[in-house]
């Protein structure tokens, strides 16, 4: 993130930079979803154990994750009767010194944590479902998930088409939404992946769409 500050000078001098450095800084990949509450699962951002425990008590099955993680690192599924729930909260929050996110567990994860790509304000018609391996909650490919490309569902398309013009207006040319069922869980703007897998499995030329979007933006 610090490097984006140095890119501001280049942008001020006329360089076209995608994604826009200021927009990258403004879009915390975990927190950005809070701008679109109509699409997200029940969510709480907190560091105090009492607040996190209250969320777990209210929603039961809960996902806890740090705000700066990636690849499924340090993501915990905690149930209300989990004997380790307090120590998990203490560990993730560094005993109340670090803010984390709590989200209601979505059973639709069994069908995959979907990566939906938006390129230059246009929605790619396929997602990559990252399906958890047996015994896992996390679908991330880095955590052993299996990637299966498939056409967008109506719900996924509705979310993506709503967000696409908003994010493109902010200079975000390449965006990866994470969607479970019909709920938005993250907006990735730093290094959205799954282009290779979608292209290989469907024949849809996602890299070509990126080049086309760049040429159009710079024309």
What positions do the PLM features span?
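Anion (oxyanion) recognition and catalysis
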Residues: 11-12, 57, 168
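Conserved N-proximal alpha/beta basic substrate-recognition cap immediately N-terminal to
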Residues: 1-47, 51
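Anionic group-transfer/hydrolysis microenvironments
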Residues: 21-22, 67, 105-106, 117, ...
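Hydrophobic beta-strand scaffold residues
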Residues: 17, 62-63, 174
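Short glycine/proline- and charge-enriched loop/turn segments
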Residues: 37, 141-146, 191-193
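ATP-dependent carboxylate activation and anion-phosphoryl transfer catalytic cores
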Residues: 135, 151-219
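Phosphate-binding site of ATP-dependent enzymes
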Residues: 49-50, 57-61, 68-159
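Short glycine-enriched loops at secondary-structure junctions
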Residues: 21-25, 130-132, 180-183
